[in-house]
Regions:
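Alpha-helical bundle regulatory/interaction domains
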Residues: 8, 40, 44, 78-82, ...
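Short helix-capping/turn signature of helix-turn-helix
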Residues: 51, 104-109, 153
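Amphipathic alpha-helical packing segments from all-alpha helical-bundle domains
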Residues: 86-90, 94, 110-148, 154, ...
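Solvent-exposed, amphipathic alpha-helical segments
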Residues: 14, 18-26, 72, 98, ...
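Residues in the recognition helix of alpha-helical DNA-binding motifs
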Residues: 50-51, 60, 176
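Basic, helix-initiating cap at the start of DNA-binding domains
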Residues: 1-39, 44, 49, 55-56
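Short acidic alpha-helix initiation/capping motifs at coil-to-helix transition points
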Residues: 35-38, 151-156
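Amphipathic alpha-helical linker/stalk segments
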Residues: 21-25, 31, 56-87
Length: 188
């Protein structure tokens, strides 16, 4: 009985991983159940039986992938700028190019906006948590501005500018980001 439950769980994970992989290859809501089934090594009926619809599959896959991202980024130590930047760089080295493609596709495929918006929410919450010690500014206006600065500097586009456009090594890009964040973490 346990072996059967374990096999069913593994099948579900293979299906979700297939959906996530296909999505990142070509960010679109036009993912076919047949492609997902083929990639996962199961029948289309298995995918439908398990998730009911393409919409449910995509929602489940997004939630499943999001949990992995949250776990990865959750390792960032609060108040430790170099440590947090290292975790952020790990994340962007794995997902950065994909996220940039998603954000570009969002313009053409408005249905992707929900996924992009969720990513923005996760990023904002991460910045609030990680940089909490530096958000104790004197006023709400200052806190809001400082948070916006952290969000912008730690954005995937900053990673792209440093790594892809400027051609910096990961180590140099990480150092550059720490240097850019440094003035925001000093008392004025």
């Amino acid at each position: 009985m346990q072996a059967r439950a374990d096999a069913a769980e593994l099948t579900g994970e293979r299906i979700l991983q297939a959906a996530v992989d296909i999505f990142w290859e070509r960010p679109s809501v036009q993912i076919s159940l047949e492609d997902v089934a083929e990639r996962a090594g199961v029948s289309s009926r298995t995918v439908i039986r398990r998730y009911g619809s393409k919409e449910n599959l995509l929602a489940s896959a997004a939630e499943w992938a999001g949990a992995g991202v949250a776990q990865q980024r959750g390792q960032a130590p609060v108040g430790d700028v170099p440590g947090s930047v290292s975790v952020l760089m790990d994340h962007y080295e794995e997902y950065g190019d994909r996220v940039v493609r998603l954000l570009a596709a969002e313009v053409e495929v408005p249905a992707l906006s929900d996924i992009a918006d969720k990513g923005r929410e996760v990023h904002m919450a991460w910045c609030k948590r990680v940089f909490a010690p530096y958000l104790d500014a004197a006023s709400a206006v200052q806190r809001r501005r400082r948070l916006a600065q952290f969000v912008a500097l730690c954005d995937v586009y900053t990673w792209k500018l440093l790594r892809r456009d400027a051609g910096l090594s990961r180590r140099q890009a990480e150092l550059a980001l720490v240097e850019m964040l440094s003035p925001l973490t000093k008392e004025s």
